[in-house]
Regions:
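Membrane-proximal intracellular helices of multi-pass ion channels
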Residues: 1-138
Length: 138
């Protein structure tokens, strides 16, 4: 099993996901809301992606079926946890880690389940982020 190749692909996935967080940042600018939570989330996810990718960027071996299955499993867990960061950083939600990961995993799996009691009161960039997770997952 080539763990370096798996780590490299995980880094690429995180780098791509971090770029999608720029969309809610743009929405926050448009609506005049704070970008701090999303900007911090972007930076965390982007730099973790860089840390996973760059040490392994010269790895060129073929991915076998076993590694492909592991990459898909890691994909779901990693994106669910890193997708929870904006929910954790939003002070209006007061989410625990479990609630934030549940909300993120719900978006990635497009189940539509939520722990938010009044979705209409969320700020617009966070609403956009929730829908973006569902779009990316679907």
């Amino acid at each position: 099993m080539n763990y370096y190749q798996i780590l490299k692909i995980t880094g690429i996935i995180l780098l791509i996901f971090s770029l999608f967080i720029l969309i809610p940042i743009s929405a926050a600018f448009f609506y005049g809301e704070s970008i701090d939570n999303f900007l911090q989330s972007f930076l965390i996810i982007f730099f973790v992606g860089l840390l996973a990718y760059f040490p392994n960027k010269k790895e060129r071996s073929q991915i076998k079926i076993r590694e492909g299955f592991l990459i898909v499993a890691i994909f779901w867990f990693v994106l669910s946890f890193f997708g929870a960061i904006p929910f954790l950083m939003d002070e209006s939600l007061k989410f625990s880690l479990v609630d934030a990961v549940f909300e993120s995993a719900s978006g990635w799996t497009t189940t539509g389940a939520t722990v938010v009691s009044n979705i209409d009161n969320l700020n617009k960039p966070l609403l956009l982020y929730r829908q973006l997770l569902q779009w990316l997952g679907g």
